[in-house]
């Protein structure tokens, strides 16, 4: 309703100003500004919906205050360009319409009415309401009801008798199981759902709307609110250290806790969270690649669901035979947005909707078949009678190719339970949320019926029942939940552990690299993750007088304040203010002790602007002084004009990537010498090994042969045509996720370059 009202007010404002207000520069500027704000808000809402499927939420607020550079958003570049172009077009059209009758006399009354209507349209817009509520949640000091409803469970289950299998289905919300809306989409898993305790109204709350957040909510009974973006949790060394979560209780009760997934465990700090709360046995992409039958059978995120669930079954079988009490948690990935992935073993590889194939629905149909097969193996085993099986979505589906069809339905998360000891077939329509999942499981296992803010849906009352405005209530509790992290409020002395890549201060530990914003009685950690901006881009958003401590590889800060360290991959510590003084210190000991020393100096805005501009230089445009191209640092030597076909720096060097160019091309500013040696230190990937690799300069071509290990080869070139471009053409680029950033499309790797040096041998 508010959406229609805001649009009506917007149109009324435009029409009244365009046809009645007449000409006045001030009123025109004011009205255009407010109407433009309305447009920006609604385009932001649309764009946010595209990424999150949930409007302008906590993750969007974080992104709006941090650079997107370096984030894994390649699949969304075209939509982003489209939104930007639409914004320019709408602004241009709006300005043209408002100035249609600019030659008519000015009328104050109509101008004022148009401005008031424009303000009303902004106030009534859902986007403005969502942003207002989020900003309020950042500024609140907490909610008195938090202390009333937050409850710590007992640390043990008195007499545990049942093993637990807990399956998180990636984005596998209950809406997919509506057979009227999506006929025959989930027949196998849907049939199992109908055999058990099916909770039909599991809503999604703020702070529970992405994978790690859904896991925290379901095991600890709290939303994932933190003083940093949730998917950057990999940088912390402990996760809600004061909380008692389901895994802690299980471990204290004699359970061996296992977790199996196909993606890298470190993404979003899943490994940190699970290790912090009772899980001693973790298996992700790195751990599974040495045990699975086909290590190359992977999608953009990791191993396919059929592979993961096959390994989970092997674990279940072995643990059941051992006779020890255990829990086995697993997380699928094939239904990840925006398209999903189809495993090769499922029968349901295609699902048509509206008369055409839909990739997301197809992925859902395939994945549910794999999950059902895993469950049926357990049910057919002699150990099912001692087992509780839980199936839940980690969160609602984000904007995938099925999202617009899902939004036409009443959307809820999936949560159902199959009890081997006591079969129960019932659909429970009680209002609940993801935070209630762990408490419900704990209740069935014989423990308490509460964890944190979660309550058992079998014997307790969910916050979703207590509060009609439960979403707003949870946001009001955000400061209380952030305080559970027990983050330090000051930093004076700190220790950098060079070998463990950690920093410790005020009793807390963080993984490196790390950026800290330091103010009175507050230290704000800004970690770096696959989906957050590089730290230098985050630092560029600091105000001129903001105090910072930045711990990162030396070469990343050297271009600003320490040119002598431009090629160093050691750790360095920089601190100061962007508009004042900065220092850079080289970490030259295994245990390096540091102190903060912020000086209250005069702020120089020219210096500030220069620092910000330098911080924002993209990697490929960085230049350093060196007599060779060093590939494990960003940028290139000063002599290089541009280069292409080369992937990002890694600790050892860089791969060629045919996705970025069929050949490696390095163009120098000046012609290469008439006669020179080309010294190449490199290795080959896959089928490129032990094959001739053409290397060209002008009209002359040499061949390079590399093995899988790094070696140094010298090629002799004549350059009579004064060519300035070096070209290397790997013969068989291999499409692979090896070393890839999680969630990104595969790279096409050819050779791995460590160093290339041009040695002049003229005369």
UniProtKB/Swiss-Prot annotation:
Its main location: membrane. Disulfide bonds: none annotated. The keyword Membrane applies. It is a multi-pass membrane protein. It is found in: Cell inner membrane. It comes from the Bacteria. GO terms for biological process: glucan biosynthetic process. The chain crosses the membrane at residues 1-21, 26-46, 77-97, 108-128. Pfam families: DUF7024, Sulfatase. Gene3D superfamilies: Alkaline Phosphatase, subunit A. One of its GO terms (molecular function) is phosphatidylglycerol-membrane-oligosaccharide glycerophosphotransferase activity. Its EC number is 2.7.8.20. Transfers a phosphoglycerol residue from phosphatidylglycerol to the membrane-bound nascent glucan backbones. Belongs to the OpgB family. PANTHER family: LIPOTEICHOIC ACID SYNTHASE, PHOSPHOGLYCEROL TRANSFERASE I. This is Phosphoglycerol transferase I. It comes from Salmonella agona (strain SL483).
């Amino acid at each position: 309703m508010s959406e229609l009202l805001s649009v009506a007010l917007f149109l009324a404002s435009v029409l009244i100003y365009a046809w009645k207000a007449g000409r006045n520069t001030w009123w025109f500027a004011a009205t255009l500004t407010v109407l433009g704000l309305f447009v920006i808000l609604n385009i932001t809402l649309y764009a946010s919906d595209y990424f999150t499927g949930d409007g302008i939420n906590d993750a969007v607020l974080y992104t709006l205050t941090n650079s997107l550079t370096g984030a894994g958003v390649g699949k969304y570049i075209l939509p982003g360009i489209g939104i930007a172009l639409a914004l320019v077009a709408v602004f241009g059209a709006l300005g043209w319409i408002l100035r249609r009758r600019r030659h008519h006399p000015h009328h104050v009354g109509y101008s004022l009415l148009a401005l008031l209507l424009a303000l009303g349209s902004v106030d009534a817009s859902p986007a403005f309401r969502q942003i207002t509520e989020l900003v309020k949640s950042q500024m609140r000091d907490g909610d008195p009801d938090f202390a009333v409803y937050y409850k710590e469970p007992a640390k043990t289950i008195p007499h545990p008798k049942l093993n637990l299998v807990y399956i998180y289905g990636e984005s596998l919300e209950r809406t997919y199981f509506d057979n009227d809306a999506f006929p025959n989409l989930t027949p196998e898993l849907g049939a199992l759902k109908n055999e058990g305790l099916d909770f039909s109204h599991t809503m999604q709350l703020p702070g529970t709307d992405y994978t790690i957040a859904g896991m925290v909510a379901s095991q600890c009974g709290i939303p994932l609110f933190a003083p940093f973006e949730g998917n950057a949790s990999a940088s912390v060394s402990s996760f809600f250290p004061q909380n008692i979560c389901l895994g802690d209780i299980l471990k204290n009760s004699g359970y061996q806790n296992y977790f199996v997934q196909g993606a890298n465990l470190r993404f979003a700090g899943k490994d940190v969270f699970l290790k912090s709360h009772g899980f001693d046995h973790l298996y992700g992409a790195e751990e599974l690649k040495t045990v699975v039958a086909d290590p190359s059978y992977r999608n953009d995120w990791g191993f396919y669901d059929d592979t993961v669930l096959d390994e989970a079954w092997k674990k279940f079988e072995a643990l059941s035979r051992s006779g020890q009490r255990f829990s086995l948690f697993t997380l699928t990935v094939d239904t990840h947005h925006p398209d999903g992935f189809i495993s090769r073993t499922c029968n349901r590889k295609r699902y048509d909707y509206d008369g055409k194939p839909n990739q997301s629905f197809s992925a859902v149909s395939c994945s549910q078949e794999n999950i059902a097969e895993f469950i049926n193996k357990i049910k057919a085993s002699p150990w099912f009678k001692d087992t509780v099986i839980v199936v839940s979505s980690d969160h609602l589906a984000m904007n995938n190719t099925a999202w617009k069809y899902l939004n036409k339905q009443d959307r809820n998360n999936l949560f159902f339970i199959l009890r081997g000891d006591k079969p129960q077939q019932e659909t429970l329509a009680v209002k609940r949320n993801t935070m209630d999942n762990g408490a419900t499981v704990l209740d069935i296992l014989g423990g308490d019926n509460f964890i944190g803010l979660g309550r058992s849906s079998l014997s307790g009352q969910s916050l979703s029942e207590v509060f009609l405005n439960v979403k707003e209530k949870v946001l009001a509790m955000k400061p209380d939940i952030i305080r559970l992290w027990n983050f330090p409020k000051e930093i004076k002395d700190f220790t950098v552990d060079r070998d463990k890549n950690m920093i410790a201060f005020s009793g807390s530990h963080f993984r490196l690299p790390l950026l800290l914003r330091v103010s009175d009685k507050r230290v704000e950690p800004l970690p770096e993750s696959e989906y957050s901006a590089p730290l230098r881009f985050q630092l560029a958003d600091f105000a001129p007088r903001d105090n910072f401590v930045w711990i990162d590889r030396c070469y990343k800060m050297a271009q600003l304040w320490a040119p002598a360290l431009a090629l160093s991959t050691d750790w360095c510590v920089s601190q100061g203010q962007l508009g004042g003084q900065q220092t850079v210190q080289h970490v030259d000991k295994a245990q390096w002790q540091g102190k903060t020393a912020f000086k209250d100096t005069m702020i120089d805005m020219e210096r500030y602007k220069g620092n910000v501009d330098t911080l924002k230089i993209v990697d490929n445009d960085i230049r350093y002084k060196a007599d060779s191209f060093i590939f494990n640092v960003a940028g290139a030597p000063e002599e290089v004009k541009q280069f292409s076909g080369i992937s990002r720096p890694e600790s050892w060097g860089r791969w060629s990537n045919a996705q970025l160019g069929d050949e490696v091309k390095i163009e120098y500013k000046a012609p290469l010498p008439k006669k020179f040696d080309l010294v190449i230190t490199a290795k080959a990937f896959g089928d490129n090994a032990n094959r001739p690799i053409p290397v060209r300069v002008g009209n002359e071509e040499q061949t390079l042969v590399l093995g899988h290990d790094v070696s140094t080869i010298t090629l002799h070139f004549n350059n009579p045509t004064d060519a300035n471009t070096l070209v290397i053409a790997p013969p068989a680029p291999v499409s692979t996720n090896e070393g890839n950033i999680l969630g990104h499309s595969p790279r096409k790797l050819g050779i791995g370059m460590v160093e290339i040096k041009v040695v002049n041998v003229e005369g």
